[in-house]
Each structure stands twice: as C-alpha cells, then as structure tokens.
Amino acid sequence: MPSLRPVLFRGARAALLLLLPPRLLARPSLLLRRPLSAPSCAPISLPAAASRSSVDGAGAEEVLAPLRLAVRQQGDLVRKLKEDKAPQVDVDKAVAELKARKRVLEAKELALQPKDDIVDRAKMEDTLKRRFFYDQAFAIYGGVSGLYDFGPVGCALKNNIIQTWRQHFIQEEQILEIDCTMLTPEPVLKTSGHVDKFADFMVKDVKNGECFRADHLLKAHLQKLMSDKKCSVEKKSEMESVLAQLDNYGQQELADLFVNYNVKSPITGNDLSPPVSFNLMFKTFIGPGGNMPGYLRPETAQGIFLNFKRLLEFNQGKLPFAAAQIGNSFRNEISPRSGLIRVREFTMAEIEHFVDPSEKDHPKFQNVADLHLYLYSAKAQVSGQSARKMRLGDAVEQGVINNTVLGYFIGRIYLYLTKVGISPDKLRFRQHMENEMAHYACDCWDAESKTSYGWIEIVGCADRSCYDLSCHARATKVPLVAEKPLKEPKTVNVVQFEPNKGAIGKAYKKDAKLVMEYLAICDECYITEMEMLLNEKGEFTIETEGKTFQLTKDMVNVKRFQKTLYVEEVVPNVIEPSFGLGRIMYTVFEHTFHVREGDEQRTFFSFPAVVAPFKCSVLPLSQNQEFMPFVKELSEALTRHGVSHKVDDSSGSIGRRYARTDEIGVAFGVTIDFDTVNKTPHTATLRDRDSMRQIRAEVSELPSIVRDLANGNITWADVEARYPLFEGQETGKKETIEE
C-alpha cells in the first residue's frame, strides 16, 4: 500500500511523465499539452504533431499507450483502496485522479483524429444563423443566454425528429403517452431528491452581480495560470492536483481555493463573493397567496411516476408496460454555453418502462441482438481502454449489459439516432462508473456523440430500480405497486397493529389520521419491537411528519393471523431512456454538415429525408406563365400526399436555387423545365440533394415517388434503377415561346 500512495497525491502530469518511455520524452511535440482537467465536452486545442492527419493508427497508439497505462494503474489503485476499506477521503481523491486521467486520455484521442473528421463549426453556425434554423431568444433586446427561438427550418426539423421518435418508440412499442403539467409543487421534488441534490456552487461579481459557476471559473482560472511560461513545475503540479479533485470540493474548500489563487471576475476583474449553493430549478409560487411553492419541472419523468396507478389500471393491471412524455423542462444553468448543448429550457422525450424486477427479460430483444455498436463499459474506462464495437447479444451474454430490457432499449436508441442522421461511427454508449451514478440510478448507459465539443451526452438510459415509486409511496402513503398472480396460492403469517380508533381520536383529535396512517404501513419487525415495549412498559412512542405521539395499550394492540395469498405485490423497477432533443438536433447539424467538393462557399445539410425540414422543392426553370399550371399541380399533389415542400419561383439561376435549398437540407428537388411544357406526356426532373444526380419521370408520378423516398419505403438507388437519368433538356425557351 505505501508504494501506491505517492501516485495518489502527486500531480497527475508528473505521474504521467514517469510512465512515458525515454523515446517519447525526447519528442515533446508528442506529449500532452492540455491541462489534465480539460473536460470531454470542451473544445480541444490540437497539438501541432498530433493534429496532422498523417499520424497513422500505430503512431497514435504509440502516443496513447502511456496514457492508457496511467488510467489502468489508477483504476487498480481505486479498486485496491475499496477492497482494503481505505478512508473515504483517500478513495475520493483516487477516483478524482482517475477521472482526470480519463479526461487526458480522451482529449488526446480526440486530438489525434483526422483533421477532415472535424466540422468547420464557425461555417456551420454561420449557415444556421443566416438561414434562421435558430437564434438567441429576445435578440433585439440584447438576448438572454441559454434561451433560443427556432425559426421555420429549425422548427420543422425539430418537429420531424419528434414525430420520428413517436413512430419509432410510441407506435412500435405501444407505449402509453401522457402530457403532464410543467408546474410542480415543492413536496413532489423534495421527495424525488431534486430540491436537496439538484444544485451547483455559484459565485457573484460583488459590484455588478454577474454570476459564475464556481467550479468552472476556478478551472478556467487555474488553466490560465498554468499556461503562463513563468509558472513553476511545482506550482503547476499543485494546481493539477486541485483540478483533479475539483468535483469533490465542498463549499468552504472552494472558498479557500478562490482566496488562495486570487480568483477574480473574468469579465470585470472585480472581487467575487464566497461560493453559495444554487439550486438549478426555477422556483415559483402557485396561486395568488404565495403559500404553495413550486418549480418548473427539471425533468418530465416525475409526472409519469405520479400517474403510475392510473396507467397501471389503463393497462389492465399488467406488467410490463411503458409510458412516455414529450415536453419542455427547465434548469436554471448558472453559465449556459455551447449553443443548444447547455440551455435553460429544453425539450425532452422520456420513456419509463415498468418491469417486474425478477423478470428483466424483453421478448423482442432478438430483434436488436445482432446490432454492432460501440460500447464503453465502466470496466474499460478504468482500464484505459477505448470503446469497443460489440454485438449487442454478446454484450448481454457476457454481462457487459445487465439485462435484455436495458439491452433492447440501447439497441432501439441506436436505431433511432442513426435514423435521424447521427453517424454510427461517431456514436458510442458509455456506462456510468459507480461514482457518476445519479442518486436514483443503479445502472446507466449514455448515448454519446462525437462533436467539435468532444463527446457529449445526448441520451441517458438508466435503470432507476424502484427508487421513485418507493419514495413517492412513502411520502404519500399511497401504495404504488402492481399485483402479480402467484402460480400457486401460499399461506403467510400476518402481523399488524389493530388501533382503537375511538381512543386515538379522543387523544389526538385532528392528528389521529396521521397516527392511523403510520400504524398501517409498519412492517413486522417494527411491530414486534413495539409489542415488546407495550408488554414491558405499557406504551411506546412513534414519530411521523415531525410530530411525536405516545400510544398506550388501550389505544393499540397487535393482531396475528394467517392469510392465503393468490397475488403478491411488486414494486416495479423502471428502465428510463431520456432523450435531450436539443442535443440530438445539434449533433445532427454537425454530422450532416458538408461543403461541396471544389466549392468552399456551397454548404449543405444531408438530413435524412425522414427528418428533412422540407422533403422537396418545386423549381420552375422559367417565370413564364406556361410553367405555373405545372407548379400548382405538383404543389397540390404533394400536399395531398402529405409531403412538405417549398416552391421557389424566384428569378435566380437554377444552380443558385439548388444551392439555397441544399443549404437548408431540402432532400429532393423537382424541376419543371422546357421539356415539361413542350412535350407529352409531361415529365419533370427529380434531383437528389446529396449526389446531385437527377432522373426524369412523369409529373403525375413524382409526388408518390417523393413520398416513398421521404418515408423510407424506397431508396434513391431504387429510383435510379426504375427511371432514366436526366442528361439534359431536348427543347428550349424558343420553342416554348413560339407555341
């Protein structure tokens, strides 16, 4: 144990240097240049050598090998400390160091990716803003950070992503959809744990009141100090140790660090207030009296849990079943950033799959068992390994994924995300380590996408066990359970209190109900203990809802009897896939954004047709009136077929109009040209956005072709196999005018 201890407290960078071979130490360009605490969601500043696309797989692995070793050694240390039942403070420090080393490894992996694999974010964001996909809310008043308005194109894309979600999950799985209020009384969120645990530490500029998240500000300040050439090796090592443990500091420890490192406001240079705990929920009061505090909901899940009994009744009392809700949630982020990735109001789509804890098998798992996807298990993370592509069925068989219900939803999530435009090669499922788990979860896998910000969580798939239902049942005294028929009846011994309602009512008046409710939910062990006190002392004391009551023999006795059971009560476990639709949208933007080869100014989004904001455009080649009947005919037919489309009859060249529609991701384009007008049967061209190839078909056929393409019933390859490629017009403007 003593030989392991120095690694625990030494600066992480120094520890890593000790693990590097001399050959790499002689090549400083290959060493890590970013601070250890660089988060996986922070923009990566690539080292010169590592950013070259010429670094091959073997060369990259040579750089990564010592970092993997450092993570593996720290993971071994964490395991040993836990096995030896070391003090919790030592375990926490070791875990913090492990997380820091993981971040270093991941940052380096991202830095070594090919240069052409990184989207030009500035160019993409310019396109999004210029074409009004979305923009900052209240912009003409200066805007409010963390709040966004979606324009026509962004709104259509978002609605299509939601509609695809409904079809993929709610319709396919026959999930029960509900729509609950966004206002939530305080007791509900007190019970769920959000009031006590949903908080961050915050500091304020003492002069202008501007707020900053304390850990983020301290991290940025220390990174700035460490980048100074005058900063000594000892000082850097000290600051790296601070950064490695940043997640574990309490309020007073953070306050001391702000003083020690003289942290000021990064905007004004003013002094900062001491850190205070800041709850991330938006607080309000329900009703004019101000007597009922409440919050805007931080998640949609609680509404489903509170309606569990009604949903169970709707499902004829049977398990398993699932309920879902799509709606807005709110988190009062201290310093929102990174566009749609961290906002204060966001749309969520959540599923709560209620299942018997003894029967966590999904009958449809074989439908997804053969999928191959990248899995990043907790074991791989602490061993310094990368995500590994695995067959989903093998992952469940080998115990990487706990059960087929969780495995089934991971597979369905993968299929949905790739359907809406997320690249399978930039998508992984990462298992939470034990110290990362939310207060309500016993296992959790996040779908993470690789973006220019690094790996970001876009979907969480948590096994919430029976946490929420049990908490709400205890708080409300309402049993949130399902009844499970027994294969054979069984006889059980029952022990319960038998209260004397008259005596209790006389003694405690209006509080008698509290006493009766408490006695009704006591378990056998507690009742037996209180019975002994009754026999010995003639009384015992109970405490409920902050009040104490003394009960005597004339108020209560204990009843024992046998009971034959035909059903047993089960508190269901809950598997919860939770989708952040804003983050999914942002990932789709990055993964589908392209620049036309040979023309840096022509950008386009290759949205899959199923979610494209417009399925096709209708483009008359000329403004001649003879073209207008065909425009009208096509537009009306497309509408009848349920195909969203955009008519562009402006005077610009056809190439420029193609570029405009490509820029907003219109999947296909119908062009009415001179052959359409001059020849019978009347035909028009259909253009594919991504390949820019065109076919020619009769005008009457085109709406159904576009509909089938948009619904995924056929592919562009199918269309090209059935219809002739368009090579060029056979007639021109002159013939049209003469006619």
Swiss-Prot record:
Source organism, top-level taxon: Eukaryota
EC number, as in UniProt: 6.1.1.14, 2.7.7.-
Sequence positions bearing N6-acetyllysine: K204, K501
CDD domains membership: GlyRS-like_core, GlyRS_anticodon, GlyRS_RNA
Positions with a binding annotation for ATP: R331, N332, E333, R342, V343, E457, I458, R583
Pfam short name (any one): tRNA-synt_2b
Entry's Gene Ontology BP terms: diadenosine tetraphosphate biosynthetic process; mitochondrial glycyl-tRNA aminoacylation; tRNA aminoacylation for protein translation
Function in brief: Catalyzes the ATP-dependent ligation of glycine to the 3'-end of its cognate tRNA, via the formation of an aminoacyl-adenylate intermediate (Gly-AMP). Also produces diadenosine tetraphosphate (Ap4A), a universal pleiotropic signaling molecule needed for cell regulation pathways, by direct condensation of 2 ATPs. Thereby, may play a special role in Ap4A homeostasis.
Annotated protein name in UniProt: Glycine--tRNA ligase
Native source species: Pongo abelii
